[in-house]
């Protein structure tokens, strides 16, 4: 196999990677990658994954997200998780513990507090 097989494969799966290596990846591309991480991997989403993938610092990606969206990555992730949980509560017969786990929370009381802050109500009226 060619010595650059791994790099070639990474470039094919992530077309922005060569731009990152050349120092030309846009802030918008980083923010889009962060938002994609939230929507596609919200259960275990991490901004560190995006920073590592694009070869930039966590602080830089975080700053890009906040500058472009007006919210922190954590706020955006929580919003997506809460909206997903609310949808699941309305449309499924899963119990609340299953939903809490599926949306990425391990601490039930923390989930309830966030849910109540966001919606001002419990499961029955969600």
What are these regions (language model features)?
Residues 7, 50, 92, 114-117:
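Low-complexity, intrinsically disordered/propeptide-like segments
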Residues 5-6, 62, 82, 105:
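Intrinsic disorder/low-complexity signal
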Residues 48-57, 61, 65, 99-106, ...:
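Append "Primarily bacterial transcriptional regulators
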Residues 1-45, 49-60, 67, 71-73, ...:
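Inter-domain helical "communication" segments and dimerization helices
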Residues 32-40, 67-106:
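Terminal helix-turn-helix DNA-binding modules in bacterial transcription factors
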Residues 45, 64-88, 110, 114-126:
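Alpha-helical DNA-contacting segments of helix-turn-helix folds
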